């Protein structure tokens, strides 16, 4: 199959998965379904796992930095929501260390410090070979209920 058909077929599959539900809630919202995110929690860590598909790649054939940033943001935001309630990102800093070309990716969000009015979180993204590909730190503010 040529590259164009692979991207077209993968993109159609991703869209069908996202359209499978109209839920817009933590753990299952349109963008997470579209990107194929599997979200789980272990102890004080939120794990976002997904498989790299051709529509997620940039023209160089590696996972697009925006997808990496999205997965890391989701891992931290979902952890905050899971432990203390919904919040919003005030700032996020990302370091890209290694390219991700294919395979299954694991992203782990955790707390650096839980404050009363501000949360400091971090996220680490690992390639399928378990090498650290990117890491992020972020400042979050809890949203009032």
Set out the residue ranges of the language-model regions.
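Terminal targeting signals and extreme-terminal segments of soluble enzymes
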Residues: 1-145
């Amino acid at each position: 199959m040529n590259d164009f058909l692979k991207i077209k077929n993968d993109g159609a599959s991703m869209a069908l998965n996202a359209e499978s539900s109209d839920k817009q809630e933590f753990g299952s919202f349109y963008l997470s379904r579209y990107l194929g995110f599997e979200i789980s929690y272990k102890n004080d860590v939120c794990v976002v796992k997904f498989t790299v598909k051709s529509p997620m790649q940039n023209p160089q054939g590696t996972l697009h930095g925006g997808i990496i940033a999205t997965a890391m943001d989701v891992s931290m935001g979902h952890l905050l929501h899971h432990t203390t309630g919904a919040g919003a990102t005030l700032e996020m800093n990302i370091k890209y260390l290694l390219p991700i070309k294919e395979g299954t990716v694991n992203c782990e969000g955790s707390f650096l410090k839980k404050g009363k009015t501000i949360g400091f979180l971090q996220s680490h993204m690992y390639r399928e070979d378990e090498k650290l590909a990117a890491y992020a730190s972020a400042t979050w503010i809890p949203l009032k209920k």
